[in-house]
Amino acid sequence: MKKWSSTDLGAAADPLQKDTCPDPLDGDPNSRPPPAKPQLSTAKSRTRLFGKGDSEEAFPVDCPHEEGELDSCPTITVSPVITIQRPGDGPTGARLLSQDSVAASTEKTLRLYDRRSIFEAVAQNNCQDLESLLLFLQKSKKHLTDNEFKDPETGKTCLLKAMLNLHDGQNTTIPLLLEIARQTDSLKELVNASYTDSYYKGQTALHIAIERRNMALVTLLVENGADVQAAAHGDFFKKTKGRPGFYFGELPLSLAACTNQLGIVKFLLQNSWQTADISARDSVGNTVLHALVEVADNTADNTKFVTSMYNEILMLGAKLHPTLKLEELTNKKGMTPLALAAGTGKIGVLAYILQREIQEPECRHLSRKFTEWAYGPVHSSLYDLSCIDTCEKNSVLEVIAYSSSETPNRHDMLLVEPLNRLLQDKWDRFVKRIFYFNFLVYCLYMIIFTMAAYYRPVDGLPPFKMEKTGDYFRVTGEILSVLGGVYFFFRGIQYFLQRRPSMKTLFVDSYSEMLFFLQSLFMLATVVLYFSHLKEYVASMVFSLALGWTNMLYYTRGFQQMGIYAVMIEKMILRDLCRFMFVYIVFLFGFSTAVVTLIEDGKNDSLPSESTSHRWRGPACRPPDSSYNSLYSTCLELFKFTIGMGDLEFTENYDFKAVFIILLLAYVILTYILLLNMLIALMGETVNKIAQESKNIWKLQRAITILDTEKSFLKCMRKAFRSGKLLQVGYTPDGKDDYRWCFRVDEVNWTTWNTNVGIINEDPGNCEGVKRTLSFSLRSSRVSGRHWKNFALVPLLREASARDRQSAQPEEVYLRQFSGSLKPEDAEVFKSPAASGEK
């Protein structure tokens, strides 16, 4: 074998690679030559070429595999294989170069990568398998974000795969992948690549890092250009009833907030690479505050973290963007976070927002509650009425009162201050007078309607002529009755158009409105039948009359005891009586069909029984001619058994007397004995169960009445009857006077009253004391929301009390050592400054 020098070999290498062994990664992939036998080693440091005559069992020294085991991705060795053909030699006369000369030659080792091999490497946290990935991508002019390296179903990239396979919170392939993407000019595309399937669409590596609670990876991704505004809007991230998923507001900032990661929240808002927009909205218009309200579930732990995170984000927003009113931003439904909390029944979050009081001077303008004075457990507070009162669209009162019956804690939310006192103030000032007046008018209307119906003409067909003086009064009463029916009809139409209640809400919350609407329908039907010359107008009229007197219960809302009693009646009708009637009708119809099948008219007319002949003896008495061979008559007869007035021998026209008696006895046992007594027991249990609930429901019904009355006013009248006063509570971040419409509430709190000792005036409850010290114009009053003029709140009092707390020296209090006696001097209390350490 002729040996060539390394210089000669190097000179011959390039033309050989170009002409005889082209690079398999260049050119059309379909025209590539088949690869050589794959190497069995994944090591890159040493590669051996086995020439003719070498043993097939020879493996590289560092090969970890056994014979017959193949890598999923082979290593292709492309080397300048030089053959020498002597003149006269045949095809078998070719000679391979010696191994020494081959080892000295220039070799080029490349490993082919596909999606499967890369995914396996990153899932196993194996950086060694990715050492040749950069060379492969550069040679093939490909990128990690190409479709061939993505999951065809989900669009998952190798970076997303690595983020999902962390080992002890780390995956060393992630920095390697980012560096490879940087050198292939695809870093931004790889970092921001997201899922493409409909289920996880939009989720990026940053979302996964936040969900995995990994601050280091979040920092790494943001440093490398991760989009902090990327929205994950797949089906899994939408709030769909009955489907698994987690709604967090789509954005990375919202995800960090909803998973209680304050550190990541602060990093996203304050990092030096790309800061998140705190006012950004998702596809439904929700901000990060809306998202926090959505994830609240009214449990103690959840409410604690949600309110804490809500407060931190609100204060961060005030510090980063002083003029931004983050809490006033609305979603696509026009709801603020406060209104959303009310509409979804998040009572813990609602109470926190309504009663939020912040002490920090730079964030004090975020407070909605301002304590004016405190004396022991009693303190007077001013509540901001913005977004609460009905003067604004989507106010909290309207959202709670007009929300669906399926809204949790709907009745309890009205007990949260200041909502409870605000509704009571509206009722006391003007609503109750209007309500009582309407009650008197309705009573007068029903009396007129009753008189017109009672003195209706009996002879002839309608319409009737007016011949006497009394007829004019009767017609006047009829006209007034019809006008009342028309009014109730259009009021019902307006109610249904505005509220659009569901079927369940219609029978639960719209109970009275539906009865008034039915009353109006019967009245209008009466008018149509009357002028159609049909005497059947009387049937429709009496139904309207009966419903009219029944609807008198609506006005029991103005009286607490009667209102609670009416609520109990309504609940028993809708819960217990409806279920009883369903089962009873089934029994009644079933046994009636069985009994009527046994009855045959005229079966025993010729042979009257002894009891029958004795019952009807006498010349003037004859057996009744009524027939029970009809379902209607049999149902009426069986109904008598239900109320204990039935007769087992109400007829003799039947076959199989034993079967007949057994059917009647079974019916009596199931209805009169079982169902009726069960109904009584259920009603008693319902009364005990919903005693407190009925009071809350009555308050809700009265709240609806208050709001309906207020909405019936003109806009100018609404402002005149508005509760509260316009007050200056401090200063806005830009230095302007902060005026708010506030409502005053005096409260007693025995839990935290000892923490308010610094918030005290010389004359608590006497506004003149504040006037003397701060030159504010006040009026002495303790009545909530009434009889007090505009005055500036006392933030200076808080600052003064804070200075007092800072200047006060803490003292240690201890007793004299017990000496065994019970003399008064043994109870002497000693005080000393804590700093001195003397005892």
From Swiss-Prot:
Glycans are attached at N604. A motif (Selectivity filter) lies at residues 644-647. GO terms for cellular component: dendritic spine membrane; GABA-ergic synapse; membrane; plasma membrane; postsynaptic membrane. One of its GO terms (molecular function) is phosphoprotein binding. Widely expressed at low levels. Expression is elevated in dorsal root ganglia. In skin, expressed in cutaneous sensory nerve fibers, mast cells, epidermal keratinocytes, dermal blood vessels, the inner root sheet and the infundibulum of hair follicles, differentiated sebocytes, sweat gland ducts, and the secretory portion of eccrine sweat glands (at protein level). Na(+) 1 binds at G644. InterPro entries: Ankyrin_rpt (IPR002110), Ankyrin_rpt-contain_sf (IPR036770), Ion_trans_dom (IPR005821), TRPV (IPR024862), TrpV1-4 (IPR008347). Phosphorylation by PKA reverses capsaicin-induced dephosphorylation at multiple sites, probably including Ser-117 as a major phosphorylation site. Phosphorylation by CAMKII seems to regulate binding to vanilloids. Phosphorylated and modulated by PRKCE, PRKCM and probably PRKCZ. Dephosphorylation by calcineurin seems to lead to receptor desensitization and phosphorylation by CAMKII recovers activity. Residues 1-58 are annotated as: Disordered. It is a multi-pass membrane protein. The modification Phosphothreonine is found at T145, T371, T705. Na(+) 2 binds at G644. The modification Phosphoserine is found at S117, S502, S775, S801, S821. One of its GO terms (biological process) is diet induced thermogenesis. Residues 778-793 are annotated as: Required for PIP2-mediated channel inhibition. Resiniferatoxin binds at Y511, S512, T550, R557. ANK repeats lie at residues 111-139, 154-186, 204-229, 250-277, 286-322, 336-359, 394-416. It is found in: Postsynaptic cell membrane; Cell projection, Dendritic spine membrane; Cell membrane. PROSITE patterns: ANK_REP_REGION (PS50297), ANK_REPEAT (PS50088). The association domain (AD) is necessary for self-association. NCBIfam families: trp. This is Transient receptor potential cation channel subfamily V member 1. The lineage of its organism: Eukaryota, Metazoa, Chordata, Craniata, Vertebrata.
